[in-house]
């Protein structure tokens, strides 16, 4: 029996990104192996032009690959197509996009929201 799953990131259906309880405007996702219970796994994240993530803290490593577009981090560092980005445990930030982006995200645990 084959237990393989193939996902084409450019041909999937996205749903509103609600990983923190309620949807974040301009953000949608497609879960590949991600478990909301454990916060572990992989998902595709699509951010529309002008979308901004919530301020949060990483409780474990998070890595992602920029598939399309650009993402701007809290310190104004710009992540571009092809970049592989690693956030270490304890990292605190939010990100936004001016023109939209598509990201392949690898999570090892759930992030914690920071009220600011």
Each model region followed by its residue ranges:
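Glycine- and acidic-residue-biased ligand/ion/polar-headgroup-sensing regions
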Residues: 49, 58-74
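Ligand-binding loop in jelly-roll beta-barrel domains
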Residues: 89-114
